[in-house]
Design a protein with these regions (language model features):
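Acidic/polar-rich alpha-helix caps and helix-coil junctions
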Residues: 6-72, 76, 80, 88-318
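Single conserved hydrophobic/aromatic residue that forms the stacking wall/gate
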Residues: 1-5
Length: 318
């Protein structure tokens, strides 16, 4: 399917978010790390699980580091590009140029705003009572070059592991299914949706206020952004990327913004390879990402076209 006209979408999005806000049933929780855990005032649409009676899931088995006692995790690990998207605690952009080569200097992880540590496992942080290493041969979080082995085996190819969405209280990952909730819609997303729609509808002050409300969450406490126009939208894009990280939004956001073919073509992902305290900036997999413009519309299945002579394929897919 293709997308509706922008103006109608913006009005619909604004009105829908406004109606939710007016219910006064939802709010931001103080601790960002609790925002996606469900059973709180931020969760709007939540799917619950039970490890014993079911339904349950295996998210932890897919993403935990090897030191959790399970050898088949870390199927996806955060990239250096994602890490560099985080501002410092004062809301400023961090200069990572020194780590775009080889250095023994410790990265500025402790300077980054609170949502970073709540989202990503990095060298020196604590995970399930262990200080993480994330290095070549590391005991707690080992590094592995891309395709060094046939499977991930719980090792990182970027120097990082995912923390967000995992159950830190789950000790027996190998023998126990996961039961943490999946929050499909939470109030922070509603505020950001409304902010974006307000921006499109030239409600600049309201857009700023809504985004700054998310940034000002009690446990995050980032200063507000006063930018406007295209500069505000760029700030908004990054704010949405950080706040909703790994919740399944960014790819679809880039599609609806019609920016994927610009930023996701010939795009490569990087990481930090850590060897005996030396940090080396690396190309994670040596592959260019591709996003041809025809991916903005989904093709009509060939079987449907064969079954109905009146159906035509989209021009992009002919």
């Amino acid at each position: 399917h293709s997308f509706p006209t922008r103006r109608s979408s913006d009005l619909d999005a604004y009105d829908a978010a406004d109606e939710v806000e007016k219910l006064q049933l939802y709010d931001l929780v103080d601790n960002y790390a609790d925002a996606w855990k469900g059973n709180n005032k931020e969760a709007i649409l939540e799917f619950d699980y039970n490890k014993d009676s079911g339904p349950n899931h295996t998210f932890d088995q897919y993403y935990v580091p090897q030191c959790d006692g399970y050898d088949f995790g870390a199927l996806g690990t955060p990239t250096q590009e994602m890490v560099e998207s985080y501002e410092d605690k004062n809301g400023n952009k961090v200069d990572w140029s020194e780590w775009h080569g080889t250095t023994t200097k410790e990265p500025p992880y402790d300077q980054l705003e609170p949502r970073f540590a709540a989202t990503i496992i990095y060298r020196g942080c604590t995970w399930k009572g262990r200080v993480m290493d994330c290095s070549v041969g590391g005991t707690n979080g080992a590094f592995m070059a891309y395709r060094e082995q046939s499977y991930s085996y719980g090792k990182t190819t970027t120097g990082y592991f995912l923390r967000k969405l995992l159950d830190e209280k789950l000790i027996d990952v190998k023998g126990t299914k996961s039961s943490q909730a999946w929050v499909e819609i939470r109030f922070a997303e509603v505020l950001l949706n409304k902010a974006e729609a307000a921006y499109r509808l030239n409600k600049t002050t309201e857009a700023q206020s809504l985004m700054n409300r998310v940034r000002g969450r009690q446990g995050v406490n980032l200063p507000g952004k006063s930018s406007s126009g295209e500069a505000w939208f760029n700030d908004y894009r990054n704010e949405r990327k950080i706040e909703l990280a790994y919740e399944g939004h960014l790819f679809w956001d880039m599609r609806r913004w019609r920016l994927a073919h610009i930023e996701y073509n010939n795009y490569r992902c990087h990481g930090l390879k850590i060897t005996n305290g030396t940090y080396e900036y690396i190309d994670c997999d040596g592959q260019d990402r591709k996003f041809p413009q025809k991916l903005y519309v989904l093709p009509v299945p060939t079987s449907e076209i064969k079954n109905n002579a009146l159906i035509e394929q989209y021009d992009e897919w002919k």
